Amino acid sequence: MTQTLTQLEYRDEFIRRHIGSSPEQIKEMLDVVGISSLNELTQKIVPDNIQLATPPNVGGGATEQEALAELKAIARKNKRFTSYIGMGYAPSVLPPVILRNLLENPGWYTAYTPYQPEVSQGRLESLLNFQQVTIDYTGMDLASASLLDEATAAAEAMAMAKRVSKLKNAERFFVADDIHPQTLDVVKTRANTFGFEVIVDKAEKVLELEGVFGVLLQQVGTTGEIHDYSQLISELKTRKIITSVAADLMALVLLTAPGQQGADIVLGSAQRFGVPMGYGGPHAAFFACRDEYKRAMPGRIIGVSRDAAGNRALRMAMQTREQHIRREKANSNICTSQVLLANIAAMYAVYHGPEGLKNIAQRIHRLTDILAAGLIQNGMTLRHQTWFDTLTVETADKAGVLQRAKDAEINLRTDIVGAVGVTLSEVTTREDVVRLIEIISGKAFSDDIDTLDALVASSSTSIPTAMLRKDAVLTHENFHLYHSETEMMRYMHRLENKDLALNQAMIPLGSCTMKLNAAAEMLPITWPEFTEMHPFCPPYQAQGYQIMIEQLSNWLAAITGYDAMCMQPNSGAQGEYAGLLAIRRYHQSRGEGNRHICLIPSSAHGTNPASAHMAGMTVVVVGCDENGNIDIADLKAKAEKHQAELSCVMVTYPSTHGVYEEGIREVCEIIHQYGGQVYLDGANMNAQVGITTPGFIGSDVSHLNLHKTFCIPHGGGGPGMGPIGVKAHLAPFVPGHSVVEMDGVTTQGAVSAAQFGSASILPISWMYIRMMGSEGLKQASQVAILNANYIAQRLKDDYDILYSGAEGYVAHECIIDIRPLKANYGISEMDVAKRLIDYGFHAPTMSFPVAGTLMIEPTESESKVEIDRFIDALLSIRAEIAQVDDGVWPIDDNPLVNAPHTQYELVQEWSHSYSRECAVFPSEATKRNKYWPAVKRLDDVYGDRHLHCSCAPISDYE
């Protein structure tokens, strides 16, 4: 035996599991690229002046079993008290059939945002269900497919109200004082950058004010009172003031829809529909509005359209509103939202149906009525006369009540002066109610629950008659057909089969980093130690979370070369916003609040200018040279021109053109010379980890897409996490929180509802870093770079590689130019993308950052076998284009312009110039394993001209 025990223990096993190719395959690819080793590859590609001598130290790797055991020990430090805190968060029950077949299913959680609708019909249908749930319960005309959280949705409502307001000189936004404090916090943060004045007061006080463009009301107040705002909203309409209403989705099952009372915008959280609290997230927010405001809505909207054969098909509608097209003029910077969580909420509604949901809501309300009656019998006073699930109980002995609750391992709401709050939920039982009566009142409960039940059932007025829902909801068959577990399981499986996710094939989307989301990384997100924690529980109960987040923050700080991390932002775009706010606040602290110019290269991702606009900055575009690099001369000229007002530059590294720009250090130096800060977008961090760091390069702040580089799955369009790393001078200016005190940052406004954003998915990134260790992380980056260069090398004779670095290499992604093919043969990047579906692949990123191109990012997780299959598909497509050029196939009837091809086409009359086999089995690989798209190419023009964003009749599904 020549192996040592250390070798046999194989602590770096996970590296081999995560990196797709074997050492032998890596060597073969290196040979094709003409390089002897991974280290030589990075030495040749990465500029010398930014290369690290050794990778950042995050420790050695660990096996899956070791990492899971270590994290489990940390998780057990969380104290699992029963939380009745409320404030927009409540325990819920995730039906096991949805847990197993959706949340834990890579066919659902590894998919990408459905930009390619032909391979996304399953989750698009589920998101349409989510929109239907939202439309029905809010009483509005149109709904989006989720936003990041309720507080963000409220801030978006304010921004939207200003966009659609006819009161152009009004700059005041009114918020009713019975709003969740975290919602108000995020609204104030957004208002500050827009220059809006936020006024908080009793709702009726708005009628005494001038210059108000919008109002935010909360139907069920944060302290529990149900508000009938119909008269107020009617009066506001006469004054042309836009009214937004924050609503509780579970309460809406019983309460009158705000839309029926005249609301213009309705928003809230769908967390109560089967999604765990998770210490604050991730949760899907819902957002709905009147039809007249549809063009001003933020976020993705799923619409019903048709495909090339005239059949019903779904797509993302009205994308011209969004940041990837409108940039700084976009309605919002929203990119990643909360699709996976929206799908869970939608399936929760599908599984329970309207009657099941009504039963749950009525049970919650009945138990709240019983609790109220029991407390009154025991001598307690309630602050309000109306409620759905939340009571505010007056007490002269608050300390005593809270001590009894603590002894019983119960959390009540503590921040109400002279009172405690208690919010019941789906998991509350009659036994829980008895305990609460005794704990809050300090007296034994001498009555009988059934007696109280009979009393309140016959006499309750806690929901006013005028506020009771009377209309039928969820009448579509989708909410009535799948109430048995068998039918539900099959429904989710049918939808899954329509989609292409990482469990089927590689997803080579440039700038998206669709890498492995390992099963071991995913396991902890369903542990009750993580899922059951309320975000506003006392800190001593969340020691496990705090330890895990602190360790992850320290690792990320080392990996990025920054001094501090802020883990609050819920997405990359929100991280951009938070980082730019830190820069803005830093300048203001130095008496330089006039610095508002943000320089952004023309190649930047659309979120950059959209985020800069949201942060109150003015975007000035910097040109790129013919090689795709930032034009240093143009940058310097504009930095000098705007030096008195220069706030920052936003750059991506490697660039969005897939190149390590040689002048990145010079870019940083120029900006600093003129008093600005450097924001380095972390979208391409997968080509930096272990090789260089943003801090070492010279930047001041970056966000990280944990759902790219650090293995949180994309979920079909969310969840994501976008924490920011900052240099020490910016650390005091990162987001704080109004509810939970955070070390060192208590004065700055929040950007997310919860202090750590979507905290319950952070264990995924913790597991990834812990298992890979320093060397594994560096190797992952190197192999990602190798894979991209291998693809470029093999394709270069058939496709033009648009950009490369000084040595002729690309970074972790490459761009192939389809424009010459379009000019010469009439075949577009769209045709190539759709034809790849017939070969079993999701298309690369289309027309970004350059129109008429495809950007390919293979990541380190794909094997050489899969990469070769993808390359062979592109080479075969190039040969098919030659067939068009040679006249074998007409330019208007060939397998590219007609792609993709569906199974149903095969049994129809075939009049094409090419065979059925050529259409659907274009390679040997497809004969062994075939993905069938559910629809043909979408008719985008029809979809936008005939906007329909709710469920169609069931006959259309069959």
UniProtKB/Swiss-Prot annotation:
It catalyses: N(6)-[(R)-lipoyl]-L-lysyl-[glycine-cleavage complex H protein] + glycine + H(+) = N(6)-[(R)-S(8)-aminomethyldihydrolipoyl]-L-lysyl-[glycine-cleavage complex H protein] + CO2. GO terms for biological process: glycine decarboxylation via glycine cleavage system. Keywords: Oxidoreductase, Pyridoxal phosphate. InterPro entries: GcvP (IPR003437), GDC-P_C (IPR049316), GDC-P_N (IPR049315), GDC_P (IPR020581), PyrdxlP-dep_Trfase (IPR015424), PyrdxlP-dep_Trfase_major (IPR015421), PyrdxlP-dep_Trfase_small (IPR015422). Gene3D superfamilies: Aspartate Aminotransferase, domain 1, Type I PLP-dependent aspartate aminotransferase-like (Major domain). Its cofactor is pyridoxal 5'-phosphate. GO terms for cellular component: cytosol; glycine cleavage complex. The keyword Oxidoreductase applies. It comes from the Bacteria. Pfam families: GcvP2_C, GDC-P. Its EC number is 1.4.4.2. NCBIfam families: gcvP, PRK04366.1. The glycine cleavage system catalyzes the degradation of glycine. The P protein binds the alpha-amino group of glycine through its pyridoxal phosphate cofactor; CO(2) is released and the remaining methylamine moiety is then transferred to the lipoamide cofactor of the H protein. The glycine cleavage system is composed of four proteins: P, T, L and H. This is Glycine dehydrogenase (decarboxylating). The lineage of its organism: Bacteria, Pseudomonadati, Pseudomonadota, Gammaproteobacteria, Enterobacterales. The gene is gcvP.
